[in-house]
Swiss-Prot record:
Physiological role: Acts as a suppressor of RNA-mediated gene silencing, also known as post-transcriptional gene silencing (PTGS), a mechanism of plant viral defense that limits the accumulation of viral RNAs.
Database matches in InterPro entries: 45/70kDa_tymovirus
Lineage: Viruses, Riboviria, Orthornavirae, Kitrinoviricota, Alsuviricetes
Protein name: 69 kDa protein
Domain of life according to the entry: Viruses
Sequence segments annotated as region (Disordered): 1-24, 141-492, 537-628
Keywords: Host-virus interaction, Inhibition of host innate immune response by virus, Suppressor of RNA silencing, Viral immunoevasion
Family listed: Belongs to the tymoviridae protein p69 family.
Signal sequence bounds: none
GO terms of biological process kind: symbiont-mediated suppression of host innate immune response
One Pfam family matching this protein: Tymo_45kd_70kd
Residue ranges, compositional bias (Pro residues): 433-451
Biased composition annotated in UniProt, kind: Polar residues: 166-178, 295-305, 586-596
Amino acid sequence: MSNGLPISIGRPCTHDSQRSLSASDSRIHSRFDSLLDTDLPMVHSEGTSAPTQLLRHPNIWFGNIPPPPRRPQDNRDFSPLHPLVFPGHHSQLRHVHETQQVQQTCPGELKLSGIEELPPAPQRQHSLPLHITRPSRFPHHFHARRPDVLPSLPDHGPVLAETKPRTSVRQPRSTTRGPSFRPILLPEVVHVHDDPPHSSLRPGRSRSRQLQPTIRRPLLAPNQFNSPRQPPPLSDDPGILGPCPLAPNSTRDPPPRPITPGPFNTHGVRPLSVLPRAPPRRGLLPNPRRHRTSTGHIPSTTASRPTGPPSRLQRPVHLHQSGPHTPDFRPSGIRKDAFLQTGPRLGHLERLGQSADLRTSERTPSTKRRLPRPSEPNCLPSSLPEATLAPSYRHRRSHPLLPNPPAALPPIAYTSGRGKIHHSLPKGALPKEGPPPPPRRLPSPATPPQSPLRDLGRTPSFPTPPKTSTRAPESCIAAPPTDIAPLDSDPVLSVRTEVHAPERRTFMDPEALRAALAGLPSPPLSVGIIRTASQTVLPTNSPSPTRHLPPTSSPWILQSPVGEDAIVDSEDDSISSFHSHDFNSPSGPLRSQSPSRFRLHLRSPSTSSGIEPWSPASYDYGSAPDTD
């Protein structure tokens, strides 16, 4: 049976609540046969199913499923080791499955219940009336694990439909408002028209359709200024053979067609002129759509060679009669190696009609991309503009103050390893003598006034302060009654001198400047030292912690002998000031105080206090910009 529990091991058994399951087939296993000798009720009194009891029997073993324990704790406790559905790979138990037991009744005992009709309620949206209760649970309906859940309801038969006129379905618009309903319109039925009776019976041929005329658009007035350009007629196409030849007795071209003027225009507008005929195009294939005309009446003439120079190089063609004994004969104008011909064709200079052993003097000089010979002298500029300096913009200057052009600088002595160019001082200007000013304190923020040049003719010096004199007063500088130079506002000792010298203009070629830079020695040799007689005691602690200088290695400094060189200041050229930039110090480069004076900064060669000597006239071309 499809709804019962079919067993394919022996003969099929019937479902009967009064009878028992019996099997007497000889093919059944002895263990299973001894089990089936006993009566197994199909319906359990407590509601459990027959397959469940069959599975719980300790003497039945289905293939690879282990038997359940002998003494289970409860009949309703089903072991999870046994699945509800048996494995399908077993050929004998592939039809065993759980299902509901169908209750069989005698045909005489079947009682048909009366058809329950719904009461005619005026409101159709109400639920079912409350007097229709759910039917009682039947004991024959069971679940896989719990027989009290999901009971099946009996079939009460079809419900009689009410025969009422067709009305629109109404649904409430809102639950809070009154019983106002909005009708829902059903879609109208669209009838498909059948083919007319005189339609074509052949399915492969399409029915003839009536062509509808397109919308007629109004014609625009023709514009005489923008008339379309008409192509030349096909009769004027010369074709591949060129234009038609002239008559044999004619020696000149036929006269062109006269241009016929248009009608007289009274509005002053230039009349339209007939477009000129397009020039004959040579080298074009004839139009295949054009009808060929007979040209038997035209005598054959040879085209004359043009008198002008040819537009491209033409090689003479050598024609030789072919013979049976000359299969490998080639004309002399063609080389045997095809790769050697690619040079002249691609424009190689050595293969354009010139032999390889041709001397250089005999070759045709090339006019384009000619490089100057090394024997030719370099063109030097005849004159350069006078020495000028870039304007000084404080707080906006992004480059050091350098003369423009660089030729206005004094002669170059040497180049230091840090990228500074040191210039030698010009001769002929000696410093002037002046009274020694009183000493000044270092932390004084006021700028000292400009003073004349002090005496520097005795080769003074800056001796290294002794180790025992480092405890001197920090705010004073001791000096003998000799010449004393005033101190700048900078805590580092510096001597500022002002020198006036006659006008001296120096111009130098940039090429010569580069050659001089390359040939200069790196260390200074046989150079004098500028010294002063003042003995100074530098403070141990700097007045400002931000102005402290770390001990660094002293660079090469230009030191010129006194009495031979001096600093030149030109009044006519309005030179602003030369800076000696030292970007290793935290304070940055020194700033100019006088726009029209040279400033000479000197430092003591002492390295015990961490002070780095400066160059008297050094210009750093690669220094960082001044952004203060």
